[in-house]
Amino acid sequence: MTEKKGRGRPKGSPNKPKMELITKREKLPANADVYEILCQANIVAAENFDFAVNGLKHFGSRNGAVKLTLQWLFSPSINSTLPEGKTPYTTNIHPASDLAETSLRFEHKMFKYFVTEQVPMTRRESMWIEMLEGIPAKESEMIDLVKDGTNPFPNIDSRLAVAAFPDMEV
């Protein structure tokens, strides 16, 4: 048996990003999806904390899924009842988020079933996969990471989330 040679990432190299994020700052439409809002907040938070808080407040008032996504990510009292790891699902093929069948903006009402035991496990998992297949590809990739407690946004932390949504339990 041959031994594996250590040809992984070189020492000192940056960690591999958890997912590909938007890196260009742009003006968001009024009906922006959660992924776009959090990517822009991530960019702005690196420059100015207060502007990021105001942006999250502004878009969080229009899209209820922003607050619930951040709460699921940062609240220690919320534990996912879904299996850990990458979910096997078929990625939505629509090129733009506004062409997808649905969005987290509408599907966030189902989050309560993924963190409680109200629904049998098989039904809960099928609901999760159906939701991931219906929402835009980047949103489904993001929420699949959030389910496991992995923060894909390096500049968004619990301090920023609480500043934007003071009634959030973190």
Please annotate each region the language model reported.
Residues T2-V170:
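N-terminal nucleic-acid-engaging modules of covalent nucleotidyltransferase systems
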